[in-house]
Amino acid sequence: MVRSVWKGPFVDGYLLGKAEKVRASGRNEVIKIWSRRSTILPQFVGLTFGVHNGNKHIPVSVSEEMVGHKFGEFAPTRTYYGHGADKKAKRK
């Protein structure tokens, strides 16, 4: 289900402040965030965020195409190791 347009995009309040501090300093440092639910806004373009995946922070460089998506979409939480090997085939 899509969020109502009249509500606007959801962004945690502290995230805007952190992004402004990095922009003002001019340094290109990774902004560590735990808010996977926050929407990527146009003022985040060009910044690098470390999105927490439950284990570590995955660096995500925000581009124009990412605006409107959620941070959590770009930091997978599960690792796929493939399906289990067929033990009968190995014995032969």
Curated annotation (Swiss-Prot):
Coiled coil: none annotated. The keyword Ribosomal protein applies. Keywords: Ribonucleoprotein, Ribosomal protein, RNA-binding, rRNA-binding. Disulfide bonds: none annotated. The gene is rpsS. It comes from Bartonella henselae (strain ATCC 49882 / DSM 28221 / CCUG 30454 / Houston 1). One of its GO terms (biological process) is ribosomal small subunit assembly. One of its GO terms (cellular component) is small ribosomal subunit. It comes from the Bacteria. The keyword Ribonucleoprotein applies. GO terms for molecular function: rRNA binding; structural constituent of ribosome. Belongs to the universal ribosomal protein uS19 family. Gene3D superfamilies: 30s Ribosomal Protein S19, Chain A (3.30.860.10). InterPro entries: Ribosomal_uS19, Ribosomal_uS19_bac-type, Ribosomal_uS19_CS, Ribosomal_uS19_SF. PANTHER family: RIBOSOMAL PROTEIN S19P FAMILY MEMBER, SMALL RIBOSOMAL SUBUNIT PROTEIN US19M. Protein S19 forms a complex with S13 that binds strongly to the 16S ribosomal RNA. This is Small ribosomal subunit protein uS19.
